[in-house]
């Protein structure tokens, strides 16, 4: 039986739809009153683990799941050893650098040396500023990073931006995009090597239906 790590939250509905098109139906995971964290597909050929988006690469890397769907932002930040299989195209958003709207910062190089930048994505943020040769102090926050500039703790933030509504409501503006993030299909390397074609067939089905 194939084990699949599905991400809770914004990516879940499209993730379930992706596997349903490939013949694995986990629609019961969307039932409002269902509190279970594991689900069998209707065909009994696979089971799903419902986990936090950030934990998907962990379950796949350690072999507790054969396949998983995760945002590229999380995948890039985690740096765990997984097979990167497909760009699924949904869940698109930018990883962006943003500052207070009333600041004088129009581009990254306008930021003062050694200023504080708040982010949940500290590896991504650090790498970005190192490539630009701009010395900054990365402040790791796990909640609403927009509060960094609002409270004066940080001059800027590095965070995911979908519509920009949250930035606007908090008086922030983008001054640069680091990359575009979408949902990715990943696999456990050992599972892929030992596969008896069940994984391969599922991946090919997802690839073909996703291309339509």
From Swiss-Prot:
Where in the cell? Cytoplasm
- The keyword Transcription regulation is annotated on this UniProt entry: no
Gene Ontology molecular function terms on file: ATP binding; ATP phosphoribosyltransferase activity
Report whether Amino-acid biosynthesis shows up as a keyword of the record. yes
From the UniProt record, give the pathway where this protein acts: Amino-acid biosynthesis; L-histidine biosynthesis; L-histidine from 5-phospho-alpha-D-ribose 1-diphosphate: step 1/9
Xref: CDD domains = PBP2_HisGs
Predominant localisation class: cytoplasm
Q: Which UniProt keywords apply?
A: Amino-acid biosynthesis, ATP-binding, Cytoplasm, Glycosyltransferase, Histidine biosynthesis, Nucleotide-binding, Transferase
Give the catalytic activity: 1-(5-phospho-beta-D-ribosyl)-ATP + diphosphate = 5-phospho-alpha-D-ribose 1-diphosphate + ATP
**Which cysteine pairs make disulfide bonds?**
none
Short name of one Pfam family:
HisG
Q: EC number(s) for this protein?
A: 2.4.2.17
What is its EC class? transferase
| Cellular component annotations (GO), alphabetically ordered | cytoplasm
**GO BP of this protein:** L-histidine biosynthetic process
Domain notes for this protein:
Lacks the C-terminal regulatory region which is replaced by HisZ.
Q: What does the subunit section of this Swiss-Prot or TrEMBL entry state?
A: Heteromultimer composed of HisG and HisZ subunits.
Its biological purpose is as follows:
Catalyzes the condensation of ATP and 5-phosphoribose 1-diphosphate to form N'-(5'-phosphoribosyl)-ATP (PR-ATP). Has a crucial role in the pathway because the rate of histidine biosynthesis seems to be controlled primarily by regulation of HisG enzymatic activity.
Q: Which family does it belong to?
A: Belongs to the ATP phosphoribosyltransferase family. Short subfamily.
PANTHER family in alphabetical order: ATP PHOSPHORIBOSYLTRANSFERASE, ATP PHOSPHORIBOSYLTRANSFERASE ATP-PRTASE
> What's the protein here called?
ATP phosphoribosyltransferase
Q: Which organism is it from?
A: Prochlorococcus marinus (strain AS9601)
Q: What is the lineage of its organism?
A: Bacteria, Bacillati, Cyanobacteriota, Cyanophyceae, Synechococcales
Q: Gene encoding this chain?
A: hisG
């Amino acid at each position: 039986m194939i084990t699949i790590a599905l991400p809770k939250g914004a990516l879940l509905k499209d993730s379930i739809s992706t596997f349903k098109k490939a013949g694995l139906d986990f629609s019961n995971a969307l039932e409002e009153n269902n509190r279970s964290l594991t689900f069998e597909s209707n065909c009994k050929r696979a089971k799903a683990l419902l986990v936090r988006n950030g934990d998907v690469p962990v379950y796949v890397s350690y072999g507790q799941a054969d396949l998983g769907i995760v945002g590229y932002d999380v995948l890039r930040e985690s740096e765990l050893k997984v097979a990167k299989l497909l760009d699924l195209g949904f869940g698109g958003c930018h990883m962006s650098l943003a500052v207070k709207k009333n600041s004088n910062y129009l581009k990254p190089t306008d930021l003062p040396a050694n200023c504080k930048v708040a982010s949940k994505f500290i590896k991504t943020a650090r790498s970005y500023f190192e490539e630009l040769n701009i010395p900054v102090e990365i402040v790791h926050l796990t909640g609403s990073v927009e509060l960094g500039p609002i409270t004066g703790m940080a001059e800027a933030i590095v965070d995911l931006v979908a519509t920009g509504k949250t930035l606007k409501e908090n008086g922030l503006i983008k001054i640069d995009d680091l990359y575009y993030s979408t949902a990715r299909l990943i696999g456990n390397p050992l599972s892929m090597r030992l596969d008896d074609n069940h994984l391969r067939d599922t991946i090919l089905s997802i690839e073909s239906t996703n291309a339509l």
